[in-house]
Amino acid sequence: AKKGEYKKSFKMPLVEYDYEEMHIPNVEYDAEFSLSAKQISEMFSQLSNFGNDIIINCSEEDISLSTNGVSGEMTVDIPIDDISSYSIVEGEKITLTYSLAYINKMCITNKLSTDVDFSLSNDMPMKIRYDLGDDSSIMFFIAPKMND
């Protein structure tokens, strides 16, 4: 061996994992919308400067994202005209609270796809989906925070 180079050897035990395959049930969501992955990543990053939780409100008129904390508060109102695609059950209003840290991590992968799809229903996990093309996608599910 040359000077400054060290011989390294490793021994690692084989690991057997027990696993259970999880089935993702088909859910009819009350609201579904698509936004620019880059824009939503920037919005979530900015929102995380103000609070730990994000409140998502969806109605037939608009979508709003808001948070508040010791640093202040921030609200983003997204007009329906600015959304790539949007559908909501007529008359439905959805208000859900999520951990901003988790959503931020899920939406930081904005280079995977130009748009990100969100699917929501009251008291159901939110689905965040990136279309990778060729019938491939990455989906994240995050449960809403429950009120005590």
Put a short name on every predicted segment:
Residues 1-148:
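Structural preference for solvent-exposed beta-strand-turn elements
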